[in-house]
């Protein structure tokens, strides 16, 4: 089947860069698949690729989707028959089989009261800051989110559990990788094909959580 491209004209008042972005977005095969497959975001395909590679999700597991809005990753996970808790400071529309909690993940004491002694098999984080257009600053901001996600994992991840977190490549990602190496038996970088080639976005996957006995 021939792909039909959508042409976008530069509207009055619209910057050329915006027109180029819109053209790329409308002709993105994953955006088109998102509409066809009824996923809430194209990032759903990133989790599908990560899961195919690392076999993260298994029926009956309990997982947490951090920064879940708009819900693409939670959709994918719920289709695997896992029990999903989606956490975000933004509201998320109802997804069948997903329990949504509106919290800031930095409010650990509140979350500890909520979850008590509950632990999870997989913790996912596709969190990213709103881009300011300056790569070095965006990198710093996403690494702060990575640290918040890892701190959550220290409290709530089961021994032997799995952890996935989005990073932007930069001067600090290697330090974060080394931090994960102390806590997981296996740590891998992974860039899904559905991640745009020009993006510095990658994922770090930690397999086999060793212990939460270190200071938290």
Swiss-Prot record:
Family: Belongs to the class I-like SAM-binding methyltransferase superfamily. RNA methyltransferase RlmE family.
Keywords from the named record: Cytoplasm, Methyltransferase, rRNA processing, S-adenosyl-L-methionine, Transferase
One Pfam family of this chain: FtsJ
GO molecular function, one term: rRNA (uridine-2'-O-)-methyltransferase activity
Localization per record: Cytoplasm
Gene Ontology CC entries for this record: cytoplasm
Organism, as annotated: Wolbachia sp. subsp. Brugia malayi (strain TRS)
Documented EC number(s): 2.1.1.166
PANTHER family attached to this UniProt entry: RIBOSOMAL RNA METHYLTRANSFERASE (PTHR10920), RRNA METHYLTRANSFERASE 2, MITOCHONDRIAL (PTHR10920:SF18)
Positions annotated to bind S-adenosyl-L-methionine: 71, 73, 88, 104, 126
Superkingdom of origin organism: Bacteria
Entry annotation: catalytic residues: 166
Function summary: Specifically methylates the uridine in position 2552 of 23S rRNA at the 2'-O position of the ribose in the fully assembled 50S ribosomal subunit.
UniProt enzyme class: transferase
Reactions it catalyzes: uridine(2552) in 23S rRNA + S-adenosyl-L-methionine = 2'-O-methyluridine(2552) in 23S rRNA + S-adenosyl-L-homocysteine + H(+)
Protein name (record): Ribosomal RNA large subunit methyltransferase E
């Amino acid at each position: 089947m021939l792909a039909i491209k959508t042409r976008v004209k530069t509207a009055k008042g619209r910057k050329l860069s915006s027109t180029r972005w819109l053209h790329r977005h409308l002709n993105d095969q994953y955006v088109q698949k998102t509409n066809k497959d009824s996923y809430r975001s194209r990032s759903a395909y990133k989790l599908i690729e990560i899961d195919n590679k690392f076999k993260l999700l298994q029926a009956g597991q309990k997982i947490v989707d951090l920064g879940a809005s708009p819900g693409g990753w939670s959709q994918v996970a719920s289709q695997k028959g896992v029990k999903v808790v989606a956490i975000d400071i933004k509201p998320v529309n109802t997804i069948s089989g997903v329990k949504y909690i509106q919290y800031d993940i930095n409010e650990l004491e509140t979350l500890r009261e909520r979850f008590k002694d509950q632990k999870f098999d997989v913790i996912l984080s596709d969190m990213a800051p709103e881009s300011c257009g300056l790569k070095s600053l965006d990198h710093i901001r996403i690494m702060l989110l990575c640290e918040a996600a890892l701190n959550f994992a220290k409290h709530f991840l089961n021994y032997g559990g799995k952890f996935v977190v989005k990073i932007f490549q930069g001067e600090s990602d290697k330090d974060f990788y080394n931090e994960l190496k102390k806590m997981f038996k296996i740590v891998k970088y992974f860039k899904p094909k559905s991640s745009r080639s020009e993006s510095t976005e990658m994922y770090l996957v930690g397999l086999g959580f060793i212990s939460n006995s270190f200071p938290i």
